[in-house]
Amino acid sequence: GSKSLLLQDKNGMVSNTTSISAGLDYPSNSPLHSHLKDLGRLSVMSVSDEEVLESFKTVSQLTGLQPSLEPCHSFAAIAKLAPSLSKDHIIATNCCGNALKDMDILSERLKLD
């Protein structure tokens, strides 16, 4: 067994989740993430599907890469968080995958041909 955090409604039932990225449409996280949060070494924030799509467009335009939608959640969170940090603050994130698996979603949501 394991102990972890999960999204719950006011009655303690597992909440429904939605995400533009199927890989992140899950109401819980790993026990490691819960442990790091308990230690004060991790904080979490949410981003909207629109913010994720905007981060996809920005990263694609600036780098020529087309990341999958999962890391675009991280990029969107960084875009929200960075203005509140000092200029010498270091932000690290990971970019994995590519958008090939997400092309149907991207084409529909970004109105691509």
State each model region's role.
Residues A77-D113:
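Catalytic phosphate/nucleotide-handling subdomain of diverse soluble enzymes
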Residues P27, S68, K101:
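Short, electropositive, low-hydrophobicity segments enriched in small/polar residues
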Residues V52, H73-A76:
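Short acidic loop-to-helix transition motifs that present clustered carboxylates
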Residues G1-L65, E108-D113:
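Active-site/ligand-binding loops adjacent to catalytic centers
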Residues M45-S46, P67-P71, T93:
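General beta-strand structural signal in soluble alpha/beta enzymes
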Residues H33-H35, H73, H89:
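Histidine (H) residue identity feature
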